Amino acid sequence: MRGPTGYALATRGVTECRNGHQVSLTSGTGLHRSKLPLTLWFHAAYLVSTLTPGISALQRQKQLGISRYETACQLLHKLRSALVAPDREPLHGEVEVDEGFIGGPEEGRPGRGAETKSLVVFGVEIIRYAAPDPRNPDDPQAQVEKLRAGRVRMNVIPDASTETLMPWCALNIEAGSRVITDGWPAYNGLEKLGYAHRRIVQSVKGKKTGAYLPMVHLIVSNLKRWLLGTHQGAVLPRHLPAYLNEFTFRFNRRFWRGPAFHRALGLIIHAEQWPEYDTLYRVAKGGIGAGVHPSSPANTRPKAGTHGDTAGPLDVVVT
């Protein structure tokens, strides 16, 4: 770092060349000019990347010994903003895609009418594997096929239209993959994008929706439980995209805690500049990933049976 003409300034912890240019250990990284000790940054990155239930700003303040709650909040916001790799590999293979509303209920405005709810699109890789058949414990050759979730992607979206969902799929799912959705007509253009599309139309009233797209509903359930348990459900719509980043990062690395910490450090170091709070949580006026919650009826999906829930040639009817 010092170079042939540099020398260390003991009073400032930087190296200066003969031309007066100063370089520190954190120059060119996301930690440049931070007033917090590097050990505190590393400890915070470890907590956010490895703890299964996550950690709230108040918990972080207590564990790290930070005197001001606002400092803990800013630290957590900056870490979340760096947890998404710009060159991450898209989902591939067999992928379930669906949307759901995330957020707390409002008094007098239940369900999708609540303005605190945000529409989120989910993509989940499906991994199929063989497991011993519990019905034949004495036969070691008897096996059954089971499913588990692979990697996930999720983003806040302004609506569930074709104009929103098709670009999201093209950006997050590798061409040639098999995409499984429900009967919502906004997905009808997937074949034109090069995907093998399987539509599952719910045909049995009273059957749990999780039986049709099980991995997506598992992820949605885990996300809601995490937001409710760790953050008591107190997540503002403008903050939700950053919380989705944190959940996605940790879920995709749930089997590799050590590498997750090193990956988080790498993303933090290579973040050239931290976004300011208003930039990170700016509420855009639409587009993929915008922090806009659908408060108008035009942005909600019709009830089942009113948007083409009839089986076509490519439909798979689950009974």
Task: Annotate each predicted stretch with a short phrase.
Residues M1-T319:
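Residue-level recognition of single "structural anchor" positions
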